[in-house]
């Protein structure tokens, strides 16, 4: 059994980086506090996660299940690295993709009420190695709900890769199998993570400002 890594642990007192050090779209200039995880660091960590995934799951057909919308950037980049490993290996395996859409946030709070509002026929997961790819684990309730749903289709194996895991007292204790970064209890946006659908077009993971929260509040 593989030991779960906490990922790159970012401390509670990590200040992040000044916005002026990076290219930030002008329309978000007043809406962010700091750059928290630069895009290059995200990509380097994702490349290593791809290797870990293939080491643990690469013996059988993998179905990569993307949790939309926030997971799509991480999903695309992770799969690019996995595909590169697959085509350069002496032993390659088939890989297919599926998508599911969940809703559990309003403004900056997880509602605790997870709704499946889109997705393909999950019966295709039966007997497969399933890799669920998520942007962030906050309380963990959303992922527990999704795992219960997926397991109804009797996959051979289910593993979860999450770019971010938040340290929060609201956590139910769930930890994914593959973690990019463990972060403090801050509301972050960018790299497809949104605040009421805004900020998905940022390359970096950033901390939203109070001005930004007020501006884009639902």
From Swiss-Prot:
Pfam families with a match to the protein in the record: Pribosyltran
GO cellular component, one term: cytosol
Record GO terms (molecular function): guanine phosphoribosyltransferase activity; hypoxanthine phosphoribosyltransferase activity; magnesium ion binding; nucleotide binding
Pathway participation: Purine metabolism; IMP biosynthesis via salvage pathway; IMP from hypoxanthine: step 1/1
Reaction(s) the record says it catalyses: IMP + diphosphate = hypoxanthine + 5-phospho-alpha-D-ribose 1-diphosphate; GMP + diphosphate = guanine + 5-phospho-alpha-D-ribose 1-diphosphate
Places the protein is found: Cytoplasm
Main location, first listed in the record: cytoplasm
Record InterPro entries: HGPRT, Hxn_phspho_trans, PRibTrfase_dom, PRTase-like
GO biological process, one term: GMP catabolic process
Cross-link Glycyl lysine isopeptide (Lys-Gly) (interchain with G-Cter in SUMO2) residue location(s): 115
Ligand binding (GMP): 69, 134-142, 166, 186-188, 194
Modified residues (Phosphothreonine): 142
Sequence position, cross-link Glycyl lysine isopeptide (Lys-Gly) (interchain with G-Cter in SUMO1): 115
Known role: Converts guanine to guanosine monophosphate, and hypoxanthine to inosine monophosphate. Transfers the 5-phosphoribosyl group from 5-phosphoribosylpyrophosphate onto the purine. Plays a central role in the generation of purine nucleotides through the purine salvage pathway.
Protein name per its UniProtKB record: Hypoxanthine-guanine phosphoribosyltransferase
Organism taxonomic ancestry: Eukaryota, Metazoa, Chordata, Craniata, Vertebrata
